[in-house]
Amino acid sequence: HQFLKRYKSTVPTVIIGNITAGGTGKTPFVIWLANHLLNKGKKVGIISSGYKASLEIPTLVTGSSNPSLVGDEAVLIAKKTNCEVVSCGNRVEATKFITKTRFFDILIHDDGMQHYKLARDYEVVLINNKKLFGNGLLLPAGPLRELKSKLDTVDIVAYTNNNTKPY
């Protein structure tokens, strides 16, 4: 992915994602991480992909936003955190939008692992420890969005669905 021209935000960017299709708990992890950073005194901005959203432009999300317009995950994040949340499938435009008139110590992108047009400072991959990598094959033959070797390049690998705290 080195050949792609990437947009680099002036704000440190954390990507939360996975390498498999299906749920790994990315949104709950984003909520936990955002609240943890807020408790440490950090100003956090969050970008959500707006999955199943009808709006295609960067949109500021509140807890009372219409989920059909901005995506249900974005509304949930806005309700569960005291962060500014922007919903948009175009992560570069969403990043530009949220940082244009606001200051943040850190940006968190929910489900942004495969969006390589956006440079990232940190990558966190979540793995469902009950499903792991399925049959080990890439989509559509298996559940992998990327090769398992991606795990060698990320900053943190966290296993979910194991009933441990803090997440």
Model segments located where?
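Walker A (P-loop) phosphate-binding motif
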Residues: Q2-G63
